[in-house]
């Protein structure tokens, strides 16, 4: 009785955030279309992908570790000591992170060329020079993305999920508009500037500037203690997230001697990351404060129910995603990207690599929720240890497989260690909470497989038609078919989604 209303509320919040995330991904995809058309997989595109990797790694490391430590400490501080102390803690962390990342940005700009030379040994001198030029612009992402991640976590603690999604939507709109305006004539330099400006806009829109300057942030002993606790909880996360965040740097290092491979892997990785974000990010964001609250209350029944609901939701999303990417990646990439300087060979390589990254999508989605469970227990060491072991295995496999198998070997190694990590984490959670965390997952899996098979059949039929961009028509028709089959099979998540859109009709139909 307690769980179902909460699950309905979570689904509504997840749906709103997922729709906003879908808008962001749509804009990011427009940018990918422009890049594919104007630059394909040529050397300038290699330079852009290489230059953006380190800033994204650093900002992802700082934002991910600090945000994951911030949420449980902020929620606990607000509940036990008061909202004023929690507010002061948050503003102090924003100030410290601003100072640290601004200093890091300036140091990185001055060391741009030696840094790029070390990270990309396969580049010649001209490629190193060009990559360093772009890196000087893109290195500002270390500041804006890190601060944006902390601001996002702060808003999520107050349930302001739509605000953060809307801010990212506006920021991506700025990036696409500026790239569209200047990219064709100004080249990759204008693209880099557009990306940096978009990140700044996203951060600026999420901060409560008026309240900060009007309310201030009284520094007290309690708030300083909360800041120290947050930083101490963050330290193990830095090590653990370093594994995931350093993974792209290792990939760039291994592929730098292969012309075009960095760009091809970049396209596939960004598409996989977009799918991963769409499938898990909204759910993890909404569920994390609830998980932290149940853990703080030591209510294992509610915690178990929240985890089971999240796993059922992810199962319903991931099964059709895997079906689409394994069987229909090639026609999708062909219809979406193959134009301008993006060739048929690029389509073949990118689609094969994307299909091989399905393990990353599944493991990353389930791992996002699993890690949040440990963080809600204020246990950051266990995910770190698992991540270190998994990354070590993955790195060894990459060095072993890159020579005989190229990009496919790298993608397979990445998928393997992501899946290994999540299997271990879910196993440990089940040992502590019991098999109740998997309640209803098997039934959801069966329904998702049946629905995905029906959707794949419809998509295959449309691929054989003469429609323009048949894969897109097939994806749309397959999605509708999947929803219809799930409703007919009385899947609870599907019915709740229908009730959200048609509340009166859905209740009458089910009664």
Each language-model region and where it sits:
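Membrane-embedded alpha-helical bundles of multi-pass transporters/translocases
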Residues: 2-511
């Amino acid at each position: 009785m307690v769980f179902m209303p909460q699950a309905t509320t979570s689904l509504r919040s997840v749906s709103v955030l997922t729709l906003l995330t879908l808008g962001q991904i749509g804009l990011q995809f427009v940018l990918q279309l422009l890049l594919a058309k104007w630059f394909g997989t040529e050397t300038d595109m290699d330079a852009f992908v290489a230059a953006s990797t380190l800033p994204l790694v650093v900002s992802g490391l700082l934002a991910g570790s600090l945000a994951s430590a911030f949420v449980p400490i902020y929620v606990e501080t607000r509940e036990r000591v008061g909202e004023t102390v929690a507010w002061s803690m948050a503003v102090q962390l924003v100030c410290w992170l601003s100072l640290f990342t601004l200093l890091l940005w300036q140091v990185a700009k001055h060391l741009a060329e030696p840094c790029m030379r070390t990270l990309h040994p396969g580049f010649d001198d001209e490629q190193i020079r060009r990559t360093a030029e772009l890196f000087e612009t893109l290195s500002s992402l270390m500041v804006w993305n890190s601060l944006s991640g902390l601001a996002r976590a702060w808003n999520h603690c107050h349930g302001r999920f739509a605000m953060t999604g809307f801010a990212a939507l506006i920021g991506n709109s700025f990036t696409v508009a500026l790239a569209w305006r200047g990219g064709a004539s100004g080249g990759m330099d204008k693209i880099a500037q557009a990306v940096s400006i978009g990140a700044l806009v996203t951060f600026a829109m999420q901060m409560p500037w008026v309240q900060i300057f009007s309310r201030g942030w009284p520094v007290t002993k309690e708030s300083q203690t909360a800041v120290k606790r947050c930083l101490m909880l963050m330290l193990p996360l830095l090590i653990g997230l370093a594994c995931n965040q350093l993974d792209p740097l290792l990939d760039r290092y291994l592929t730098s001697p292969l012309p075009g491979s960095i760009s091809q892997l970049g396209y596939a990785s960004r598409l996989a990351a977009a799918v991963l974000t769409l499938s898990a990010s909204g759910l993890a964001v909404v569920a994390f404060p609830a998980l932290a609250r149940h853990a703080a209350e030591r209510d294992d029944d509610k915690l178990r129910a929240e985890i089971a609901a999240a796993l059922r939701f992810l199962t319903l999303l991931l099964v059709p995603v895997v079906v689409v990417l394994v069987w229909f990646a090639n026609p999708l990439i062909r219809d979406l990207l193959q134009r301008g300087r993006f060739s048929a060979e690029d389509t073949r390589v990118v689609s094969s690599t994307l299909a091989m990254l399905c393990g990353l999508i599944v493991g990353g989605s389930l791992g996002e929720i699993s890690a949040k469970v440990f963080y809600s227990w204020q246990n950051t060491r266990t995910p770190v240890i698992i991540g270190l072991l998994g990354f070590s295995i993955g790195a060894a496999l990459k060095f072993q497989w890159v020579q005989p198998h190229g990009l496919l070997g790298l993608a397979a190694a990445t998928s393997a260690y992501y899946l290994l990590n999540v299997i271990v984490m879910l196993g440990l959670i089940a040992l502590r909470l019991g098999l109740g965390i998997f309640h209803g997952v098997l039934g959801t899996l069966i329904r998702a497989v049946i629905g995905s098979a029906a959707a794949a059949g419809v998509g295959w039929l449309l691929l054989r038609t003469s429609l323009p961009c048949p894969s897109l028509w097939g994806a749309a028709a397959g999605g509708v078919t999947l929803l219809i089959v799930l409703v007919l099979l009385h899947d609870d998540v599907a019915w709740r989604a229908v009730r959200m859109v048609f509340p009166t009709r859905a209740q009458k139909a089910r009664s």
